[in-house]
Amino acid sequence: MDFGSLETVVANSAFIAARGSFDASSGPASRDRKYLARLKLPPLSKCEALRESLDLGFEGMCLEQPIGKRLFQQFLRTHEQHGPALQLWKDIEDYDTADDALRPQKAQALRAAYLEPQAQLFCSFLDAETVARARAGAGDGLFQPLLRAVLAHLGQAPFQEFLDSLYFLRFLQWKWLEAQPMGEDWFLDFRVLGRGGFGEVFACQMKATGKLYACKKLNKKRLKKRKGYQGAMVEKKILAKVHSRFIVSLAYAFETKTDLCLVMTIMNGGDIRYHIYNVDEDNPGFQEPRAIFYTAQIVSGLEHLHQRNIIYRDLKPENVLLDDDGNVRISDLGLAVELKAGQTKTKGYAGTPGFMAPELLLGEEYDFSVDYFALGVTLYEMIAARGPFRARGEKVENKELKQRVLEQAVTYPDKFSPASKDFCEALLQKDPEKRLGFRDGSCDGLRTHPLFRDISWRQLEAGMLTPPFVPDSRTVYAKNIQDVGAFSTVKGVAFEKADTEFFQEFASGTCPIPWQEEMIETGVFGDLNVWRPDGQMPDDMKGVSGQEAAPSSKSGMCVLS
C-alpha cells in the first residue's frame, strides 16, 4: 500500500469537507461553539479608553473599515434627516457597478429622486454647481463629484452626531474585540499546501467563524540561520498595508513556540502556471479571453501596490492564484520593496530569471515599470504556454537568458491576436521610458488599450464580472503531500533577547479590515449587533448578560446586520 498517497487522500477529503461546510450564508454549521462564545462584545467600561488611542477620522472609520461603515450607515438610517444623503450614497454606488445598458435609466431615476427640489428625497445640502454638473454629465465617473459632495456633507455634522451616539460606542466594542489576542489555538490546520524557503503553507480554519485561510508558517530557527528577519518583516508589513480584492490579504499575524505565522486569504484554485500546463496537457495555455480577464485583474492589483509606492518584483504565473470563484490575486510579496517618501526609484537584484526587466538585470535604478515587463512575460506565457525568451522545456543558463532579455526581439505565434501582440510588445519594451505602465498615479493607459475593449473595469473592480473558468470544488489544486517534502531540523540556533523582541513585533495580531470582513461575511457581526427597539442602551454595553436581562428582553431586541 502506498501510505504517502493514502495520507494525501485522507488530508484532501478532510479539507474538501471543510470547504463544503462553509459559505457566507451557513457559517454556523462549521463554527466551534467554544471559540464562538469567546467572541463577545465587552461592556463599555472595558473599551471607553479606546477613544484616546484610535484614529477617529471620518474616512478611516466610516468609509474604509467595514464594521465602521455599517454602523455609520445604521446610524444614518435611524435619523430621518440623514435618510436622503444615505440613500443617495448607496444609489451612486449601485450606479457605478451597474451594467452599461441599465445606467441611463438609473441615472435618470437618481436625478429625479435627489436633485429635483420637489422630490421627497431632495438633497438640499448640495450646491448648485455640483447639481448642474450631475444633471448635464454623462459617461464614466458621472456621479463621482456628487458622491464626494455627499461624503463631505456626511463627514461634518452627521459624523459628529455619530460620535455622540450608541452606534459609535458599539464601534468601540468591536475595536476592543478586534484587538484581543487570537493565536495558534484559534485555528485548525488541514493539509500542507506548499513549501517555501523558510517554512510551509497550510490550509486552516478559524474555529470561531469557520472561515478558511492559508497559514504561512515561517520557522524561527530557519529564519535566523538564513538571515531572513528583514524579508519576513517587509512582507508582513506590506501585506498588512494593502487591501485589494486582487492581492492576497493578511488577516492575522501571531507566533508559536517554533514559527511566525501569517494567516492570509486562501486561494483554493491553484496557481495559473498549473492551469497553463497541467489541466489540459495536450492543449496548454489559455484562450485569449481567459488570459485577458486574468491580466485585467493583475493590472488592478499592480495599480493598488504602485499607488502605495510598493514595487512587487516577483510577478510570474506561480504567484498568481485562483480563488473558488475563478478570480485571481497576486501572492507572495516576499521580494516587494516599499519606496520611501520622496523616493521614485530603487536598486537591487530581485525576481525570477526570465521575468526581470532589462534595467534590473543591468544593475540600474528602476521603478514600478519592472512589474509591467513581468506582466508582459506573464501574459505571453498564458497565451503561448512558453516564455518569450526560451522554448518550453528549454534549459537555459541565467547568463544566456539575460542576454536574450537584453537583446533578443520577441516573436509571437499565431495564437496572438493583433491586440494581444501589441499589448505584449508595449509591456516588453527594453526601454522603461517607452514601456506601457503606471503613469500619473494610475494604470489608465493600460485600461484604455484595445485588448480590454470587452472589460467593464467598474464591474471587474467591484467583483461583479463572471470569471471565464471556475475551479472544481472537489479538487485540491496542490501537490501530493509526499511531493511537498519536509524540512530537516535546524540545529545550533539559540535565541537571544533581540530575537524575542523581533518575534513579538512580528506577531501584531489581527488586521482590521480583513478581520471585520470576516465578522460580517460569517454572520458573527449580525449575531452580536443586537439593539433595543426603544433606542436605549443595549444590555451588552452595560455588561448585562442575556441570562441576567429581563425575561422579555429577548423578544424586545432587534438585529441589524
UniProtKB/Swiss-Prot annotation:
List residues, modification Cysteine methyl ester: 558
User: Its principal location?
Assistant: membrane
Against Pfam families, the record matches this protein to: Pkinase, RGS
Substitution effect: residue 3 to A: Reduces interaction with RCVRN
Q: How does it sit in the membrane?
A: Lipid-anchor
UniProtKB keywords: ATP-binding, Cell projection, Kinase, Lipoprotein, Membrane, Methylation, Nucleotide-binding, Phosphoprotein, Prenylation, Sensory transduction, Serine/threonine-protein kinase, Transferase, Vision
Q: What is its EC number?
A: 2.7.11.14
Return the annotated region ranges for C-terminal.
453-561
Q: What class of enzyme is it?
A: transferase
Enumerate the residue ranges of region (N-terminal): 1-186
Chain positions found as Phosphothreonine: 8, 489
Which family is this protein grouped under?
Answer: Belongs to the protein kinase superfamily. AGC Ser/Thr protein kinase family. GPRK subfamily.
Summarizing the function annotation, the protein's role is:
Retina-specific kinase involved in the signal turnoff via phosphorylation of rhodopsin (RHO), the G protein- coupled receptor that initiates the phototransduction cascade. This rapid desensitization is essential for scotopic vision and permits rapid adaptation to changes in illumination. May play a role in the maintenance of the outer nuclear layer in the retina.
Question: What is the protein name for this chain?
Answer: Rhodopsin kinase GRK1
